[in-house]
Amino acid sequence: MIINYKALLDKDDLISLFEWGELSEGGQRNKANKVMKSIREQYKKDKGIDWKDTFIYRNISQNVIPTETFLKCCPEFKKSFRR
């Protein structure tokens, strides 16, 4: 799956990238949440600051992850982005 490059990824982007279409909607969301949690932890290790602390509005940080950190953790997806 090829998607347009953007700074932030949401759950739907992850579902498309990992091709979880055969799973139930709940299963897709559950797997996406696990990936997002691990990316946020990596962001904190790299930057020394919580991902949620980079946003003024807390609810935004819960729904997206930084693409840069995602690609650092999952370099096999670099070819899945179109700039």
Q: Model-found features: residue ranges?
A:
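Polar low-complexity intrinsically disordered regions
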Residues: 1, 45-49, 83
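Short, amphipathic alpha-helical "recognition" segments used to contact nucleic acids or chromatin
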Residues: 1-7
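Residues in the recognition helix of alpha-helical DNA-binding motifs
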Residues: 5, 35, 73
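Residues within the helices of the helix-turn-helix
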Residues: 11-12
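Major-groove DNA-recognition helix of helix-turn-helix-type DNA-binding domains
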Residues: 17-68, 77
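Helix-turn-helix/homeodomain-like alpha-helical modules used for DNA recognition
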Residues: 72-83
